[in-house]
Amino acid sequence: MLRVAEVRESAMEVNSATGRPFLIEFAADPDIIIREEMAHQDYRNVVAIEVKSGTDISNIHNRIGEAEKSHQKARRRGFTECWTVVNVSRLDMTKARSESPSTDRFYSLTELVSRQGAEYDDFRRRVMSLTAIPSPPT
């Protein structure tokens, strides 16, 4: 069961199965970061997520380029996973991967918001796995 320890304006802290706190933070660059607290004020950077919410397909490649720049910075800061969430209905994945090679995973915002389907399930499983957040009982 998800154990939320603290909710702040731009972050929430959840306790993992190991007892270590994970911070899920909303930031400027990247948009969302997930970090594990190893010791007081000592963090392991886990996931950096860029959210590109614009719906204009003609501008998606510029937005993916912006995500790439953000992910390159995140990699230099030690983030091990970089994900990009897009809000367009059609995305040429081959081109997107070539424009943002540092993106480990692309997700559809529509799929995530719907809270169902293969992309949502993959996103959820990966977050839970990388943060050791226990699954709810089935």
Regions found by a protein language model. Give the residues of each.
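Catalytic core segments in nucleotide and nucleic-acid processing enzymes
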Residues: 2-138
